[in-house]
Amino acid sequence: MTIPALALQIPALLVLAAVAVAGSSFAPEADDALRSAKQIYVGTRRKDGMPSAVVPVWFMFDGEAIYFTTGPESHKARRIVRGSPLLVWVGRRDGPHFVGRAELIRDPAVAARMAPEYDRKYWIAWLGFFRPNPERVREGKTVIVRVLPGS
């Protein structure tokens, strides 16, 4: 691995090394940021223990958990199934961060609940683009990732 490549991994390594938030709620700083942020940045852990690339995703936060969608065969989904913790930065790559427990859910009702929130937060979702679709969840083309505090 080259020095520049390693430098890009250092923030993710620091989060992996951090102590997870205890209890059943997010830390106050993360909770506040989740209520106003338009996106989160997420990463997982590879089989070799190294952090994956960190990517921005749109999300819904209901005060208890974070929800976002991904493809069932995506690297994120496969690593979550394998038990990888989810590394989360809120709002920006240097924003509040934590390690979360992620699970895949396949409930079209959750996608239906997410859609109006996406419409409110993201103008392009209001047009029908990139919005959670219950039918795609029902057909297995999309899965929902639920993220809870802790690892």
Question: Which residues make up each language-model segment?
Answer:
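Short beta-strand segments
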Residues: 37-72, 86-89, 97-101
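Hydrophobic alpha-helical segments typical of transmembrane helices
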Residues: 26-29, 55, 76, 114
